């Protein structure tokens, strides 16, 4: 698999984080691991990318958090709000349209071989 270029993530991080939180609450490190494992390792994002995005989504009211104690350690667990569920549905609809259009265009082209 080719390494994921960071610029490809622009505009999609919010949707990815909302999708990872859809099944239920997760603490920050679990979110990072869910992104990595759910993408077969393609999305291995640093904490400096994920935590600020989680805080931004929380300020926007798309996710909320609660403190939990796990293994004797306090961790903040994030979960989707109703607005987050709605926004995720909207992101999915837009992604379906976008990816269909891009796939249609890219499959028509013959790309030059790269060395």
Feature-to-residue mapping (PLM):
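N-terminal helix-turn-helix DNA-binding core of bacterial DNA-binding proteins
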Residues: 5-49
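Basic amphipathic alpha-helical segments that dock to polyanions
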Residues: 50-57
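A positively charged, amphipathic N-terminal helix/segment that binds anionic biomolecules
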Residues: 1-3, 78
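Short beta-strand/turn micro-motifs at beta-sheet edges
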Residues: 3-7, 65-67
């Amino acid at each position: 698999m080719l390494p994921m270029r960071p610029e490809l993530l622009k505009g999609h991080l919010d949707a990815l984080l909302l999708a990872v939180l859809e099944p239920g609450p997760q603490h920050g490190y679990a979110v990072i691991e869910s992104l990595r494992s759910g993408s077969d390792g393609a999305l291995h994002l640093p904490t400096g990318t994920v935590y600020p995005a989680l805080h931004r989504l929380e300020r926007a009211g798309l996710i909320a958090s609660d403190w939990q104690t796990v293994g004797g350690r306090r961790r903040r667990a994030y979960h989707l709000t109703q607005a987050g569920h709605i926004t995720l549905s909207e992101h999915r609809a837009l992604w379906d349209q976008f990816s269909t259009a891009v796939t249609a265009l890219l499959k028509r082209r013959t790309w030059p071989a790269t060395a």
